[in-house]
Amino acid sequence: MHIGTTLSQFIIEETRLYPGASGDFAGLLNDLTTSCKFIGAQVYRGALVGALGSAGTDNVQGEVQKKLDIISNEAILKSMDWTGHLAGMASEEMDDPYPIPRNIPRGKYLLLFDPLDGSSNTDVGISVGTIFSILKAPVAGRDAELADFLQPGVEQVCAGYALYGSSNMLVYSTGYGVNGFTLDPSIGEYILTHNQMRIPEDTSEYAINMSNHRHWQKPVQRYIDELNQGTDGPRQRDFNMRWVGSMVADVHRILCRGGIFLYPFDQRDPKKPGKLRLLYEANPMSYLVEQAGGAASTGTTRILDIVPQGLHQRIPVILGAKNEVERVVAYHQGSFVIP
């Protein structure tokens, strides 16, 4: 499809790729994007309506919730629970799955989401976003159970995010590549602006929080040290570091112009070997990156192959340019020898 196509038209055209499609999924995606428009508007108006700052509560992760975390979470729940497309929902901000109201028919999909990734940055105007993952319910027409959500990332039927920054963008994939849409506020519609986004196999940019260097395992320390040595080191070229501190913003940059993102294994707390949540962040972003020609790994395991052990499981994440990710994996395996 061509640049300038509306999201509504794009969804209809894409639905035709699936013989026998009922239209349920198209309806689900349209309803979800409506909630993303609402959240984007709240983010942009945050300081004007007193929506910035802490809500005075913690989420299941033990993290301080921002007011916009709660607003965004409620926006998605209330936009989606009445539609009849879903059997259940799970949110990073909630301990347990969210049940569909009793008077609403149960659908055949499950929605998992991080309502406002990077919300700690809202007070300083840095890009944030909503990340989502859609799975098929193992049994359609009944209430979703906890085990239904614990599917490996390869089972996702759709993944994406909405980015709230200099513009409101929606980026998603249903397994036919990655496409990006920009919200035209004059008509209230997302318009195709980034067709078939691709990640180059090689890169000279990396994203990592260098302040944690001493806590990483040796393979990651080796990899980053070599990048920092630039032309004087074994890579024999210079690399640039970019770090926003908002995963959705860092991954968006990689989808637009390439790079590698690392939030590696951290040895400070054995109970939290990684910071990022498998179901709400790692799986959907890994799906997008692979669809764009990149790779995603924990350092030892392909992320999309991991069978979740719980709703809020955390893992290390290394994703982006295929050749760079494979190099980091090889360092973990001890199989990469400098020529």
Curated annotation (Swiss-Prot):
Mg(2+) 1 binds at E92, D114, L116. It is an enzyme of class 3 (hydrolase). Mg(2+) 2 binds at D114, D117, E281. Pathway: Carbohydrate biosynthesis; gluconeogenesis. It is found in: Cytoplasm. Its main location: cytoplasm. InterPro entries: FBPase_C_dom (IPR044015), FBPase_class-1 (IPR000146), FBPase_N (IPR033391), FBPtase (IPR028343), Fructose_bisphosphatase_AS (IPR020548). It catalyses: beta-D-fructose 1,6-bisphosphate + H2O = beta-D-fructose 6-phosphate + phosphate. One of its GO terms (cellular component) is cytosol. Its EC number is 3.1.3.11. Keywords: Carbohydrate metabolism, Cytoplasm, Hydrolase, Magnesium, Metal-binding. Substrate binds at D117, G118, S119, S120, N209, K275. GO terms for molecular function: fructose 1,6-bisphosphate 1-phosphatase activity; magnesium ion binding. Binds 2 magnesium ions per subunit. CDD domains: FBPase. GO terms for biological process: fructose 1,6-bisphosphate metabolic process; fructose 6-phosphate metabolic process; fructose metabolic process; gluconeogenesis; sucrose biosynthetic process. Signal peptide: none annotated. It comes from the Bacteria. Its cofactor is Mg(2+). Belongs to the FBPase class 1 family. PANTHER family: FRUCTOSE-1,6-BISPHOSPHATASE-RELATED (PTHR11556), SEDOHEPTULOSE-1,7-BISPHOSPHATASE, CHLOROPLASTIC (PTHR11556:SF35). Homotetramer. This is Fructose-1,6-bisphosphatase class 1. It comes from Acidithiobacillus ferrooxidans (strain ATCC 53993 / BNL-5-31) (Leptospirillum ferrooxidans (ATCC 53993)).
